[in-house]
């Protein structure tokens, strides 16, 4: 599992195989099964310069950037995959009118 602090919140990314199993009868923390099956998608807001830096960082570390484009209404997005196959995106907030 990986946890990211995002401002005042926390983003939790779970190992799907581990969270899909029901807890053992004697589990100290009986967390019920949860999560999704198949690849998911997560988008994180980032400024134009941050996206450029993230793309360089990802590529320097062997992570393939699947797409890098400008939206018709303005704003850039890059897409890549995490080790579990989930689609991750950095996008400028202006794509949502923010």
Question: What spans do the regions from the language model cover?
Answer:
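Residue-level signal for secondary-structure boundary sites
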Residues: 12, 21, 50-52, 88, ...
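Vicinal oxygen chelate
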Residues: 2-5, 24-98
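Non-catalytic surface loops within mature trypsin-like serine protease
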Residues: 8, 17, 46-48, 82-84, ...
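A short, acidic/glycine-rich surface segment
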Residues: 20-29, 65, 98
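Core segments of cupin and vicinal oxygen chelate
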Residues: 1-20
């Amino acid at each position: 599992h990986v946890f990211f602090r995002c401002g005042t919140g926390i983003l939790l990314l779970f190992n799907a195989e581990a969270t899909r199993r029901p807890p053992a009868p004697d589990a100290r923390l009986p967390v019920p099964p949860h999560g999704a099956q198949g690849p998911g998608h997560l988008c994180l807001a980032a400024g134009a310069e941050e996206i450029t830096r993230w793309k360089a960082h990802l590529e320097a570390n062997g992570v393939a950037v699947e797409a890098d484009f400008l939206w018709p209404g303005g704003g850039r997005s890059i897409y890549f995959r995490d080790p579990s196959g989930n689609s991750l995106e950095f996008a400028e907030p202006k794509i949502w009118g923010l």
